[in-house]
Design a protein with these regions (language model features):
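Short beta-strand/loop motif that positions the catalytic acidic residue
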Residues: 153-154, 158-161, 165
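Conserved loop-alpha-helix segment in the C-terminal half of the alpha/beta-hydrolase fold
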Residues: 163-182
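Acidic catalytic loop of the alpha/beta-hydrolase fold
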Residues: 142-143, 163-168, 192-193
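Short beta-strand immediately N-terminal to the catalytic nucleophile in serine-hydrolase-like folds
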Residues: 108-110, 137
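Serine-hydrolase catalytic machinery in alpha/beta-hydrolase-like enzymes
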Residues: 10, 16-103
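Gly/Ala-rich beta-loop-alpha elbow adjacent to hydrolase catalytic centers
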Residues: 110-118
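Active-site nucleophile loop of the alpha/beta-hydrolase fold
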Residues: 41-42, 136-144, 162
């Protein structure tokens, strides 16, 4: 993805966690804006950190000056352990934050099952850290009980969903978002994986990351 990509092995509660860290190319002396941690879709349905939507999210953050960290949940790729229905995966997410984003600006992002995990990680992190940006794509509200977001987080949050998502129907996401008065950006004609619309998805994310709402 980038000339400054590192492959990392972290120690999680279930063993080794495999991760990739993509760093932006910046003018000398200019620090990154912060660290973004990005979670992949469902491990039992082929989800990995190399998923195209996850890569698109990483590229978006890197373009905007963030260090982007992708990782494989337990039991995926070289990550040890086994699928744990979101509980252990949330631990994995928090482990990555603790080890690779100990201080400084932090952004959270996820796709599908990864958005479910991200929302639950946010519940733990919100009172501990300043979360500057949150990006949830194809949020798996029809398959999991996705945590509501703190009201104070809404201005920092981008929720994107495809109009014709046949994996997680748009109506289910609206049912989750409505009680929170949480805006949802709908991609017309978009499916769950945004085939043919990844450039549009990237532009939406970049625009959100470039906004000053914090």
């Amino acid at each position: 993805m980038n000339a400054q990509t590192e492959r990392l092995s972290l120690r999680g509660s279930a063993g080794v966690l495999e991760a990739l860290r993509d760093a932006p190319v910046l003018v000398e002396g200019v620090p990154p804006r912060g660290v973004a941690v990005i979670a992949h879709p469902h491990p039992l349905f082929g989800g990995t950190m190399d998923n195209k939507v996850v890569q698109t999210l990483a590229r978006s953050f890197v373009q905007c000056g963030w260090v982007a960290v992708r990782f494989n949940f337990r039991g995926v790729g070289a990550s040890e352990g086994a699928y744990d229905e979101g509980r252990g995966e949330t631990e994995d997410y928090l482990t990555v934050v603790t080890q690779l984003a100990q201080a400084g600006p932090l952004a959270l992002a996820g796709f599908s099952f990864g958005s479910f995990v991200t929302a639950h990680a946010l519940q733990t992190l919100w009172s501990q850290r300043t979360i500057e940006k949150i990006v949830l794509v194809g949020t798996a509200t029809s398959r999991f009980e996705v945590a509501q977001l703190p009201a104070e987080a809404h201005e920092r949050t981008l929720v994107v969903h495809g109009e014709q998502d046949d994996t997680v129907p748009l109506a289910d996401v609206m049912t989750w978002a409505r009680p929170q008065s949480l805006p949802v950006t709908v991609v017309p004609g978009g499916g769950h994986f945004f085939h043919g619309q990844l450039p549009l998805l990237k532009s939406l994310v970049v625009r959100h990351l470039s906004s000053t709402a914090t």
